[in-house]
């Protein structure tokens, strides 16, 4: 049986108070096993990045628990616990240009975490760590003296990956790491992430809006709509047997690399008003082994009938 590294239980994240309160994430429940890539997919504003930022501690939570390696990590933490979590949980940001300090050299950008947490014995060891990781991401040691603006988007994202991985984390949150990149370099970055996962045993939370991309890298996928996770399943199970109407709509929008089939494809439009949750309240239900869907009892009966 796989060992859980991250567990999200009844998570709620809100902003503002009183009449201005906005609930961005509601009743989120999922877990991520050690060594797997778990993808969180949804359109812009769905709350997927909000969850990722809450796990790393950049967003506060209103309710529920975030469990990492058996310990609750949301809420108050000691300085020692916070420092340990920063080392063990790293984030690769969406926009490599905005997430890198333009006034710092690549050497300093990658070394900043090492300096803050004293993860080296002497200057020689620090240089060795930085040079090793910059080579691992496909750049050269001579690039360390340059500044971020001297690199392409793909190269800047490689620097962001190096900055995260030099800390030797256990868990990496990749927040749409290829959406700001040119199509020609997206596959290179995805292959790089897969390479590091295989070599270092990393666990990923991969946040994206494109289902065709996450199919390539994911073990399991969660689909989120307006702060509610509506479906969770293994990758091929989700693609072959999408149950929730929103998941079906997302999948229908994935391009097919065959012009004849693409012309015949019927796009589905998700209508949230089709759900009647006034009296029959929904919950996350396991409809098939390892396949969960957000549904009430009436919907569950209908979904199960459609599977038979």
From Swiss-Prot:
Q: Which GO terms describe its cellular component?
A: plasma membrane
- Presence of the UniProt keyword Protein transport in the record: yes
- Say what the protein does: Part of the binding-protein-dependent transport system for oligopeptides. Probably responsible for energy coupling to the transport system.
- Which keywords label this protein? ATP-binding, Cell membrane, Membrane, Nucleotide-binding, Peptide transport, Protein transport, Transport
Give yes or no: UniProt keyword Lyase. no
InterPro entries the record matches: AAA+_ATPase, ABC_transp_ATP-bind, ABC_transporter-like_ATP-bd, ABC_transporter-like_CS, Oligopep_ABC_C, P-loop_NTPase
Q: How does it sit in the membrane?
A: Peripheral membrane protein
Where in or outside the cell?
A: Cell membrane
Q: Which GO terms describe its molecular function?
A: ATP binding; ATP hydrolysis activity
Protein name in the entry: Oligopeptide transport ATP-binding protein AmiF
One of its Pfam families is oligo_HPY
Species name: Streptococcus pneumoniae serotype 4 (strain ATCC BAA-334 / TIGR4)
Q: Which family does it belong to?
A: Belongs to the ABC transporter superfamily.
Question: Can you give the residue ranges of the ABC transporter domain?
Answer: 6-251
Q: Where does ATP bind?
A: 42-49
State any GO BP term from the record: transmembrane transport
């Amino acid at each position: 049986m796989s060992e859980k590294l991250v567990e999200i239980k009844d998570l709620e994240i809100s902003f503002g108070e009183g009449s201005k309160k906005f609930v961005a994430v509601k009743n989120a429940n999922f877990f991520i096993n050690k060594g797997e890539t778990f993808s969180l997919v949804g359109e812009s504003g769905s709350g997927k990045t909000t969850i990722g930022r809450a796990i790393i501690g950049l967003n506060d939570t209103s309710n529920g628990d975030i469990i990492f390696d058996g310990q609750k990590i949301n809420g108050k933490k000691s300085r020692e616990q916070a420092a340990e979590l920063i080392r063990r949980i790293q984030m690769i940001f969406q926009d490599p240009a905005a997430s890198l300090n333009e006034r710092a050299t690549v050497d300093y950008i990658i070394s900043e975490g090492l300096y803050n947490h004293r993860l080296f014995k002497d200057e020689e060891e620090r240089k060795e760590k930085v040079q090793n990781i910059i080579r691992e991401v496909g750049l050269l040691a001579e690039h360390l003296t340059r500044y971020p603006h001297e690199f392409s988007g793909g190269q800047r994202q490689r620097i962001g990956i190096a900055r995260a991985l030099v800390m030797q984390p256990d868990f990496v949150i990749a927040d749409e790491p290829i959406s700001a990149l040119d199509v020609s370099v997206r596959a290179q970055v995805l292959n790089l992430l897969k390479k590091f996962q295989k070599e270092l045993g990393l666990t990923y939370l991969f946040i994206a809006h494109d289902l065709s991309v996450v199919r390539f890298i994911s073990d399991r996928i969660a689909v989120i709509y307006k702060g509610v996770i509506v479906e969770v399943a293994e990758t091929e199970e989700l693609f072959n047997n999408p149950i929730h109407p929103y998941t079906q709509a997302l999948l229908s929008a994935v391009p097919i690399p065959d012009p004849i089939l693409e012309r015949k494809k019927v796009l589905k439009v998700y209508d949230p008003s089709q759900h009647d949750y006034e009296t029959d309240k929904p919950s996350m239900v396991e409809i098939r082994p390892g396949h969960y869907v957000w549904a009430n009892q009436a919907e569950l009966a209908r979904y199960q009938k459609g599977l038979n």
